[in-house]
Curated annotation (Swiss-Prot):
Positions of transmembrane segments: none
Pathway of action: tRNA modification; N(7)-methylguanine-tRNA biosynthesis
Record keywords, A-Z: Methyltransferase, S-adenosyl-L-methionine, Transferase, tRNA processing
Catalytically driven reaction(s): guanosine(46) in tRNA + S-adenosyl-L-methionine = N(7)-methylguanosine(46) in tRNA + S-adenosyl-L-homocysteine
Protein name listed in UniProt: tRNA (guanine-N(7)-)-methyltransferase
Interaction with RNA: annotated segments: 124-129
Binding site for S-adenosyl-L-methionine: 44, 69, 96, 118
Active site: 118
Domain of life according to the entry: Bacteria
Organism field: Streptococcus equi subsp. equi (strain 4047)
UniProt binding sites for substrate: 122, 154, 191-194
């Protein structure tokens, strides 16, 4: 979902270089220096307005989190949440999910989150889906052996597509939830969209898969 252009968004990001990594290519292989520790790194591709990545960072101070989104205005709203939280273990990148190998070394990322990604429902747009095989190729390069992807969506079509895509790629489906909010799963941190969908009673699907 597109967010209305936010005035001053670019300046907002540029004025906060501690949290927004403006030259991420230079951080490749050096993320431990960026964070000042060697804690595990988890990334969220398509981080939206930052509720999930900020919530996770506050909940798990022993893990470093990186929120990634290509939309300028969206990332500026995520920065608002990061600044308000003052979480020391979160950073933001404005880059495309298809280019992650430009910013992370092999095995440098320990876990990935894909939350409420654009479903791109038309067949001609299949290659844009973040669970398409070319994206999985990219993710595999930056994750360690048995690296994990945690995926959430309200879109049944995208969920079924992703189940098939992960399986066809040879990934292992560790756990699958067909109605996350009706399950006994503990520790769920919601995105902005998820909270909105939950109020409407929409079903949320979730899975965990490993390479």
């Amino acid at each position: 979902m597109r967010v209305r252009k936010r005035k001053g968004a670019q300046e907002h990001l540029e004025n906060n270089p501690h949290y927004v990594i403006l030259e991420p290519e230079a951080a490749k292989g050096r993320w431990c220096e960026v964070f000042g520790n060697d804690h595990p790194i988890h990334i969220e591709v398509g981080s939206g307005k930052g509720a999930f990545i900020t919530g996770m960072a506050l909940k798990n101070p022993e893990i470093n989190y990186i929120g990634i989104d290509i939309q300028l205005s969206v990332l500026s709203y995520a920065l608002d949440k990061v600044l308000a939280s003052q979480a020391p273990n979160v950073r933001l990148l404005r880059v495309d999910g298809s280019s992650l190998t430009n910013y992370f070394d092999a095995g440098e990322v320990d876990m990935m989150y894909l939350n409420f990604s654009d479903p791109w429902p038309k067949s001609r747009h299949e290659k844009r889906r973040l669970t398409y095989k070319s994206f999985l190729d990219t993710y595999k390069q930056i994750l360690p052996e048995n690296g994990e992807i945690h995926f959430k969506t309200d879109n049944r079509g995208l969920f079924e597509y992703s189940l098939a895509s992960f399986s066809q790629y040879g990934m292992t489906l560790k756990q699958v939830w067909l109605d996350l909010h009706a399950s006994d799963y503990q520790g769920n941190v919601m995105t902005e969209y998820e909270a909105r969908f939950a109020k409407k009673g929409q079903i949320i699907y979730r899975l965990e898969a490993t390479f």
